[in-house]
């Protein structure tokens, strides 16, 4: 079986992808963010029998030498390492350029030099901005509505340029909003669940009118692997989406009904995006991934929410419910 590197393996989607790859028999190398505590993020929570199967490389995606060293001897790379919090990108855009654009450049250059068989570069539905039409297919225009989305657009275009200029075997993987166990409370679903499970009677949220297309994380991980395993995806940009949308307000009401029907939603102004930066509608098309791969959505939204609530209930100690997680 192929040897693969997962950058950002210590994060939310990356840790689930790492697990899914192990289950499919891949030889997995995990690139985690170096820290002096020698912690490996969410990988530390995996059972020992799984963790023992993973080769861990701690480094910094911004360091080209470390990235190159990590990529030596691997057949394929799943590049997920990134800064992803939109509110923090308003405060620290420089760090997003360094991590998301330069980090991707480091992966692409190393892949070119090392002759890597295939590279999956992770995009985001945020590159589309507010939908100009729905469902949003891969031909939809890009709109940089936040420093975060602008850096992901830049990373996508770098990946495209390396495919066109150097014939580098790249696939751009574009998941719509993903949720599930291990997600931080900077994302809306765990924000709602953690406040409710902490016994809050008032659930603080930002704007309730935007709509989103939510993937359960195990379906997202399966999408990455399906794109990697298909010979038809090189040079392509591919959505992972459910073609189902729900407003943040309706989402909150559904979760509140399951945990504490007496809770009320209140607007917390610090959670509101600047008006022109708010992405008001995201509803993705998934015809292309179904055409080029054998991917199919396996989890309903309701199943995913149930699994997420159950996991967070068992792991509330990992969350700080009294602060706004930027």
Regions found by a protein language model. Give the residues of each.
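Glycine/proline-rich active-site loop of Rossmann-fold NAD(P)-dependent oxidoreductases
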Residues: 153, 178-191, 198-201, 217-218, ...
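Short, hydrophobic alpha-helical segments
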Residues: 228-232, 259, 312-316
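Residue-level signal for the nucleotide or nucleotide-sugar donor/cofactor binding architecture
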Residues: 62, 91, 99-102, 146, ...
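C-terminal "lid/loop" region of Rossmann-like NAD(P)-dependent oxidoreductases
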Residues: 207, 236-238, 247-253, 260-281, ...
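N-terminal Rossmann-like NAD(P)+-binding domain of SDR-like oxidoreductases, especially those catalyzing
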Residues: 1-178, 248, 299, 307-315, ...
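A short C-terminal helix-loop "cap" of Rossmann-like NAD(P)-dependent dehydrogenase/epimerase domains
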Residues: 48-54, 166-169, 193-204, 230, ...
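Hydrophobic "lid"/C-terminal helical patch
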Residues: 17, 192, 221-228, 252-255, ...
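Substrate-binding strand-loop-helix patch
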Residues: 181-186, 209-221, 237-257, 273, ...
């Amino acid at each position: 079986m192929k040897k693969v590197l997962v950058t950002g393996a210590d994060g939310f989607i990356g840790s689930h992808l790492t697990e899914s790859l192990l289950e499919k028999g891949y030889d997995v190398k995990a690139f985690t963010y170096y820290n002096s505590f020698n912690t490996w993020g969410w990988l530390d929570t995996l059972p020992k029998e799984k963790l023992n199967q993973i080769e861990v490389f701690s480094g910094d995606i911004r360091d080209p030498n470390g990235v190159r060293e990590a990529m030596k001897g691997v057949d394929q790379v799943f590049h997920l390492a990134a800064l992803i919090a939109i509110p923090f990108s308003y405060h620290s855009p420089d760090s997003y350029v360094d991590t998301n654009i330069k980090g991707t450049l480091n992966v692409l250059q190393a892949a070119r030099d090392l002759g890597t068989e295939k590279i999956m570069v992770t995009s985001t539905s945020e590159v589309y901005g507010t939908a100009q039409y729905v469902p949003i297919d891969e031909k939809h225009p890009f709109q940089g509505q936040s420093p975060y989305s602008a850096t992901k657009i830049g990373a996508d275009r770098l990946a495209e340029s390396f495919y066109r200029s150097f014939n580098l075997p790249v696939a751009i993987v574009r998941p719509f909003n993903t949720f599930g166990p291990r997600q931080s409370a900077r994302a809306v679903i765990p924000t709602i669940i953690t406040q409710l499970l902490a016994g809050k009677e008032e659930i603080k949220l930002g704007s309730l009118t935007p709509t989103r297309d939510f993937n359960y994380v195990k379906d997202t991980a399966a999408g990455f692997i399906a794109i990697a395993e298909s010979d038809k995806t090189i040079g392509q940009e591919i959505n992972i989406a459910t073609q189902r949308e729900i407003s943040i307000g309706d989402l909150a009401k559904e979760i509140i009904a399951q945990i504490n029907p007496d809770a009320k939603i209140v607007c917390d102004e610090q959670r509101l995006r600047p008006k022109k930066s708010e992405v008001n509608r995201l509803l993705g098309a998934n015809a292309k991934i179904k055409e080029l791969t054998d991917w199919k959505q396996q989890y309903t939204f309701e199943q995913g929410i149930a699994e997420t609530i159950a996991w967070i209930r068992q792991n509330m100690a990992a969350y700080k419910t009294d602060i706004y997680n930027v």
